[in-house]
């Protein structure tokens, strides 16, 4: 396999007295340090052999280091390069040069025949494996008729939170799903559209904060590798969201979910969806808001359901997508305080200009809003227990949000 050599792409070295190496790693092993040692822009996929010998398990860190025992192997795979897989083995003379792919990061989108959400189909976003199987980074339930994602679902690795690789965001892609609709242009020309709809003096949509941004459903920072983060830059993984909310309480919700996964130190399942259509009143007439011509509806609310598969517990965060009103009705009782998200968040979650936000019990939210959950979490046991933040919580998500998203994120 002729992979482009890049000495700083990934450092795998024998841990003989390396400073800062965890004590749990044997001195006769090889280690990958995240994110410092994985710097290749044209990043390969790192695969660990499965029990049956097939290369069907993408590597995921279980902390700042991934260790290989002497004799263990790791495969370097470049989807779409059409080249063989390179197998590398950890040994006592381990001095491995790093590799990067010949082609830039790419992912595929596969439309399945599986119906979801009542009016959508399941789309898998990921890449093919050497085994012939397709590895899904996340899945989206997408309503192709109305060009609207109903929800996305992905796994958040709690042991990898905080060790994601730095990724420079690229352009959002349609992968041909939106047909002749130029969604990128619709976002860029939205102010002109709404000036025509409400008049040139309208105040519903104005920059720098009161405009519609591409609101991620499965957020890029929930993923470790650049290829995974790049995969989130799909329009089917976004819905129009006010920028003030996108970088306000919705970002705070995303931070809370990552904090929760980090404290639990295990995989959690995250389902993120939209609810209703935003209605704005002008001259006593309410109008439903669309980014396009009766397609790409602007949601009234965004919701994020978090599931602990081991304990079968769940919680739902719901945020208003209207920074102009002081109330909203998600049809469920606020249980933020009961779940451990209470007093610290009151100042922020009650601020309508950055997105009114509450926490809900799954059963109440799903039943009253007639939400059809994906089959992976459509288990009645989840409706019985509220997922709470442990008392030894990391309060990073409670602090004022200072991390800025990319422009138009």
UniProtKB/Swiss-Prot annotation:
InterPro entries (UniProt xref): DNA/RNA_non-sp_Endonuclease_sf, Endo_G_ENPP1-like_dom, ENPP1-3/EXOG-like_nuc-like, His-Me_finger_sf, Non-specific_endonuclease
GO MF term list: metal ion binding; nucleic acid binding; RNA endonuclease activity; single-stranded DNA endodeoxyribonuclease activity; toxin activity
Coiled coil: none
Compartments where located: Secreted
EC number: 3.1.-.-
Pfam families assigned to the protein according to its UniProt record, in alphabetical order: Endonuclease_NS
Glycosyltransferase keyword on record: no
Binding site for Mg(2+): 246
GO biological process: one example: apoptotic DNA fragmentation
Tissue: Salivary gland.
Glycosites: 37, 102, 351, 381
A single GO cellular-component term on record: extracellular region
Signal peptide bounds: 1-20
Active-site positions on this chain: 216 (proton acceptor)
Function: Hydrolyzes single-stranded and double-stranded DNA with little sequence specificity. Inhibits contact pathway of blood coagulation in the host by preventing activation of coagulation factor XII (F12) triggered by soluble DNA. Modestly up-regulates expression of CSF2, CXCL1 and CXCL8 in cultured human dermal microvascular endothelial cells. At higher doses promotes host neutrophil recruitment at the injection site in mouse model.
Descriptive protein name: Salivary endonuclease
Native source organism of the sequence: Lutzomyia longipalpis (Sand fly)
């Amino acid at each position: 396999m002729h992979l482009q050599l890049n000495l700083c792409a990934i450092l795998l070295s024998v841990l003989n007295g390396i400073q800062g190496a965890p004590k749990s790693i044997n001195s006769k092993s090889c280690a990958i340090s995240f994110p410092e040692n994985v710097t290749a822009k044209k990043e390969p996929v790192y695969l660990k052999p499965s029990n049956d010998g097939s290369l069907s398990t993408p590597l995921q860190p279980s902390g700042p280091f991934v260790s290989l025992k002497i004799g263990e192997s790791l495969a370097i795979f470049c989807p779409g390069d059409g080249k063989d897989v390179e197998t590398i083995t950890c040994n006592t003379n381990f001095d491995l040069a790093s590799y990067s792919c010949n082609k830039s990061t790419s992912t595929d989108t596969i439309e399945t025949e599986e119906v979801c959400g009542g009016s959508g189909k399941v789309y898998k976003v990921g890449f093919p494996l050497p085994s012939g199987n397709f590895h899904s980074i996340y899945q989206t339930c997408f309503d192709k008729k109305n060009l609207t994602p109903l929800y996305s679902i992905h796994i958040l690795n709690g042991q990898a939170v905080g060790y994601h690789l730095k990724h420079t965001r690229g352009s959002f892609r349609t992968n041909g799903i939106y047909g002749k609709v130029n969604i990128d242009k619709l976002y860029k020309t939205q102010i002109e559209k709404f000036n025509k709809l409400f008049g040139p003096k309208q105040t519903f949509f104005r920059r720098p904060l009161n405009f519609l941004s591409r609101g991620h459903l499965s957020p890029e920072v929930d993923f470790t590798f650049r290829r995974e983060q790049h995969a989130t830059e799909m329009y089917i993984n976004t819905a129009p969201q006010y920028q003030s909310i996108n970088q306000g309480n919705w970002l705070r919700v995303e931070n809370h979910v990552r904090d929760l996964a980090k404290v639990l130190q295990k995989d959690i399942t995250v389902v993120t969806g939209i609810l209703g259509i935003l209605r704005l009143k002008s001259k006593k007439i309410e109008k439903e808001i669309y980014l396009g011509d009766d397609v790409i509806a602007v949601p009234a609310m965004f919701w994020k359901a978090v599931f602990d598969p081991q304990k079968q517990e769940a919680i739902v965060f719901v945020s208003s997508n209207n920074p102009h009103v002081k109330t909203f009705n998600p049809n469920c009782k606020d249980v933020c305080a009961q779940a451990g998200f209470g007093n610290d968040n009151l100042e922020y979650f009650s601020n309508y200009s950055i997105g009114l936000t509450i926490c809900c019990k799954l059963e109440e939210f799903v039943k009253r809003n007639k939400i059809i959950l994906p089959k992976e979490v459509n288990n009645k046991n989840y409706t019985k227990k509220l997922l709470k933040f442990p008392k030894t919580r990391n309060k990073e998500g409670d602090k004022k949000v200072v991390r800025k998203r990319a422009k138009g994120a």
